[in-house]
């Protein structure tokens, strides 16, 4: 099973003239593979987020040139399934990955090549656990975003809420944030507020009575959050979408 040449990466890594650095291109494309493979495997959103986070964290600790990023990605999916108690068979991960890279190809036979790949995934999982010092449980923004959306829905005019897909957009922004390493650079609560902030900005939705309030709506959700933090997260999100247009 051959992976295509890597491309796309975390928004923080930019090369000359603002172009994505080579490492960033690889990580973006591999994260996209994790998400698409995860969907085909029937993974829930949290296990997929965990797989992406494990992948990004591993390469924060190691050199990209030393490891096959797609093998690391497959092992991340396998490990995330264990961490989030949605266990996956290595055979299914291999078959889905093979179909991803070879859409018109035949399923892999249970031959020596298959068993070598299976053993590589298992051995790679053990390597990753050691590199990450067995710290593979993460706090994701999802539960915070759900809480914030419920609160915001109660604040907003019902008509405004129903005619604009703020919630759908916020969830999409959160999902796409895992193409980069935002999950490692920012607190989960801050990311949840930032994607909600950006979703409101996209549709021009204003929170009622914000002008008269003692503090902005987003600080009600999180006292230690500042506007520069939101701006940094939003900037990284925008760079992710910019990178998406640059990478086939």
Curated annotation (Swiss-Prot):
Matching InterPro entries: Cyclin-like_dom (IPR013763), Cyclin-like_sf (IPR036915), Cyclin-Q_first_cyclin_box (IPR048055), Cyclin-Q_second_cyclin_box (IPR048053), Cyclin/Ssn8 (IPR043198), Cyclin_N (IPR006671)
Presence of the UniProt keyword Transit peptide in the record? no
State a GO cellular component annotated for this protein: cyclin-dependent protein kinase holoenzyme complex
Q: Which Pfam families match?
A: Cyclin_N
Gene Ontology molecular function: any one: cyclin-dependent protein serine/threonine kinase regulator activity
What SMART domains does this protein map onto?
CYCLIN
N-acetylmethionine PTM positions? 1
Q: Where is the composition biased (Gly residues)?
A: 1-12
Q: Kindly identify the disorder that the protein's record connects it with.
A: Toe syndactyly, telecanthus, and anogenital and renal malformations: A syndrome characterized by anal, genital and renal tract anomalies, facial dysmorphism and syndactyly. Features include anal stenosis, a rectovaginal fistula, clitoral hypertrophy, a pelvic right kidney, toe syndactyly, and telecanthus.
Please tell me what else the database record remarks about this protein. Answer: Silencing with siRNAs phenocopies CDK10 silencing in increasing c-Raf and in conferring tamoxifen resistance to breast cancer cells.
**Assigned protein family:** Belongs to the cyclin family. Cyclin-like FAM58 subfamily.
- The molecule here is called Cyclin-Q
């Amino acid at each position: 099973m051959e992976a295509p040449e890597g491309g796309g990466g975390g928004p923080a890594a930019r090369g000359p003239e603002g172009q994505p650095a080579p490492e960033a291109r690889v990580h973006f494309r591999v994260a996209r593979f994790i998400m698409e493979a995860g969907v085909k495997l029937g993974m829930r959103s949290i296990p997929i987020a965990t797989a992406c986070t494990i992948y990004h964290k591993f390469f924060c600790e190691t050199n990209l040139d030393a490891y096959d990023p797609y093998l690391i990605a497959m092992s991340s999916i396998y490990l995330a399934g264990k961490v989030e108690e949605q266990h996956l068979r290595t055979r299914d991960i291999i078959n889905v990955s093979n179909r991803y890279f070879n859409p018109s190809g035949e399923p892999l036979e249970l031959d020596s090549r298959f068993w070598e790949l299976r053993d590589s995934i298992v051995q790679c999982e053990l390597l990753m656990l050691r590199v990450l010092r067995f710290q593979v449980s993460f706090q994701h923004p999802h539960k915070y975003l759900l809480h914030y959306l419920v609160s915001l829905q109660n604040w907003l005019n019902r008509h405004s809420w129903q005619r604009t897909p703020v919630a759908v957009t916020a969830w999409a922004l959160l999902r796409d944030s895992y193409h980069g390493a935002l999950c490692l650079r920012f607190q989960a609560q801050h990311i949840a507020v930032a994607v909600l902030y950006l979703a409101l900005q996209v549709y021009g939705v204003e929170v009622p009575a914000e002008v008269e309030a003692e503090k902005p709506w987003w600080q009600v959700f999180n006292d230690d959050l500042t506007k520069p933090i939101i701006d940094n997260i939003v900037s990284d999100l925008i760079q992710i979408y910019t990178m998406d247009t640059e990478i086939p």
